[in-house]
Structures are given as structure tokens and as C-alpha cells.
UniProtKB/Swiss-Prot annotation:
The name this protein goes by in its record: Voltage-gated potassium channel
Organism: Aeropyrum pernix (strain ATCC 700893 / DSM 11879 / JCM 9820 / NBRC 100138 / K1)
Record GO terms (molecular function): identical protein binding; voltage-gated potassium channel activity
Keyword set includes Metal-binding: no
Location(s) in or outside the cell: Cell membrane
Family: Belongs to the potassium channel family.
UniProt topological domain (Cytoplasmic) ranges: 1-38, 93-96, 126-128, 146-159, 254-295
Signal peptide per UniProt: none
Database matches in Gene3D superfamilies: 1.10.287.70
Keyword tags: Cell membrane, Ion channel, Ion transport, Membrane, Potassium, Potassium channel, Potassium transport, Transmembrane, Transmembrane helix, Transport, Voltage-gated channel
TM region(s), chain numbering: 39-63, 68-92, 109-125, 129-145, 160-184, 222-253
Annotated intramembrane regions: 97-105, 196-208
InterPro entries, sorted: Ion_trans_dom, VG_K_chnl
Domain notes: Contains a central ion-conduction pore surrounded by four voltage sensors which form the voltage-sensor paddles that move in response to membrane voltage changes through the fluid membrane interior, each voltage-sensor carrying their four positive charges across the membrane. It is thought that the S4 arginine residues move through the membrane's electric field to open the pore.
Amino acid sequence: MSVERWVFPGCSVMARFRRGLSDLGGRVRNIGDVMEHPLVELGVSYAALLSVIVVVVEYTMQLSGEYLVRLYLVDLILVIILWADYAYRAYKSGDPAGYVKKTLYEIPALVPAGLLALIEGHLAGLGLFRLVRLLRFLRILLIISRGSKFLSAIADAADKIRFYHLFGAVMLTVLYGAFAIYIVEYPDPNSSIKSVFDALWWAVVTATTVGYGDVVPATPIGKVIGIAVMLTGISALTLLIGTVSNMFQKILVGEPEPSCSPAKLAEMVSSMSEEEFEEFVRTLKNLRRLENSMK
């Protein structure tokens, strides 16, 4: 009988602990599969873009307290998404501390805009106006940092996304934009969006940047949604057009033959059985003899 069963009769604590670690490792791998999915990476890039829009709107527009609270809540949700992506990339690197040192420029993008506004108001109440100016400079730095985060995220996602990913992203942009604008604009008597069809028409026109101008948002939050739909629509449509042109190029010109790198060759050889390896060596020798005989 093992020591652990003698100490804990009828159960194996260490075995359960090992199984728990194995299950945890499997869950981490599953989380990795989710985080590295092209649509998730595209969603992270859109979250970075929307976070830039939120900070720009908060910095340039005079919003009432109710709208500011909603804006800060949206920003907090976006920052949580960016934090999750950053934490996963740091874990995946194998050296989280080293990764943080290399990506210090991304840290300002992870600061909620509401926290900066809270600190700024507190410092203004104490009369520390120089520090208030410093915080306003940090807000500009926040915009720049989140903008660079968006560019790096969209570049990473562009290598993996396919046609149906982009088509789905365009459709989701239209549907979510229509839903959001309808919820925000319908109660306003001055808004021209009076039905679901008006909202859907507005979302399609805005996402494709046609902009007829017959249906426009009237509320500040509606205008923020309009900016988000325009920018996300432009990004998705640009990538979609590039993907379609690449597909036609492959059809007309043909795909290049994949090269066999030394790493792929070593992996192929290591996966062979003894008989397959011997057959592989004999084939190579026959090819060498054939090549020498043709010289």
C-alpha cells in the first residue's frame, strides 16, 4: 500500500491533486484555443478601437453626468477585455515579467478613463492644477497607447482571419449597431429613428460609409455609436475587400507550392515507423542513383 493511501485510507489525495492539475492544464489549453481564435482576436482589436473612441468622446465632448457614467462603464468593460488579452499574452510568453518590460508602452491603454477622471476631479478640488494638467497629458497618452494597441491587434488578426470571419464581422457590426442605436434613439422625440427598420437602414448606410443623411442620431450616445459603427465598418470592409482580392488572385494565378523546411522534414521523419523510415531511405538512395545516371 502506498504511503498516501496508508495516511488517507480509501482515497488518493495526490492522485486527485494530479488529476486536478491535469484538468486545469486542459482548461488553460482550451482558453488558449479561444483566445487565439481569429474572431476573438478581431474582437480584441475592435475593443481597442472602441476604447479609443470612448476616450476621444470623453475628452472632446461636454457630456452630462448620466451619459458620462454610461461612457465610463463601457470603457471599463473594454479595459477588462484588453486586460484579459494582455494577461493571456504575458502568460503565453513563458516569461511574464520579461514580457511586461518589453510591452510597457501598452500599460497606459489598460487604465480606465473613469479612474483618470476621478483622480483629476480630486486633484482639482485640492487646487493641484499642475497635476491636473499632467493627467490631461496622460489622457492624450492613453489615446495614443490604445491606438497603437488597435493597430497591433488588427495586424495580428489579419494573418488568421478568413472570408467568413470578416463577413460575419460585418454582419455583427450592422446588427449590433442597429440594436444599440434603436435602444438609445427610439425614446427621443427628436430622433429620426422611429422603427427597427430605420435603425437597420441607418446601420447599413453607416457601416458602408454611404451616409445618405435621411436617418441620423440625435443623442450624444447615438453619435458615439455612429462613430463606432463607421470605424468598425471601414476596418472590416477594408479587410474583407483585401481577402476577396487575395482569393481571386489565388484562383487565377494559383497558390505557390509549399516549401518543406528542415523542421517539417525532421517532424515527418520522427513520426515514421522503423519500416517506413527504411523505405524512405531506400527511396532516397534510388533517387540519388537515378540522378547520377542522368548526369
